[in-house]
Curated annotation (Swiss-Prot):
Its main location: plastid. It is found in: Plastid, Chloroplast. The gene is rps8. It comes from the Eukaryota. Part of the 30S ribosomal subunit. GO terms for cellular component: chloroplast; ribonucleoprotein complex; ribosome. Keywords: Chloroplast, Plastid, Ribonucleoprotein, Ribosomal protein, RNA-binding, rRNA-binding. Signal peptide: none annotated. This is Small ribosomal subunit protein uS8c.
Length: 134
């Protein structure tokens, strides 16, 4: 039985966010790099760097926190895995769901790579719905 690396990323980020940790260490694969790149571009994480330890590559990402007078407070971050190895969920570009009326994002795996729902609608392609982030 294989590992679900996307669920591992989502769980790691969610746990670090709930525990108010600043950084998350994620195993590096092509899929995880693409998802983290989207999270970085959309502003859900602050910084990403590659780290090599014992012949294995990792991504160390810094979570984004707001600063206010009382100190740092965390931004509201919710992640939900949709398509999973036991039940794949596909959608064409017209039926890609909108999260919170467009405030959240949907990450899709398409024939042209991993992209957000906005990019998929602009290009007119659908794909496998990996996760929701809001």
């Amino acid at each position: 039985m294989g590992r679900d690396t996307i669920a591992d990323i989502i769980t790691s980020i969610r746990n670090a966010h709930m525990d108010k940790k600043g950084t998350v260490r994620i195993a590096s694969t092509n899929m995880t790099e693409n998802i983290v790149r989207i999270l970085l571009r959309e502003g859900f994480i602050e910084n990403v760097r590659k780290h090599r330890e014992n012949q294995k590559n990792f991504l160390v990402s810094t979570l984004r926190h707001r600063r206010n007078r009382k100190g740092t407070s965390r931004t509201i971050l919710n992640l939900k895995r949709i398509s999973r190895p036991g039940l794949r969920i596909y959608s064409n570009y017209q039926k890609i769901p909108r999260i919170l009326g467009g405030m959240g994002i949907v990450i899709l795996s398409t024939s042209r790579g991993v992209m957000t729902d906005r990019e998929a609608r602009l290009e007119g392609i659908g794909g496998e719905i990996l996760c929701y982030i809001w």
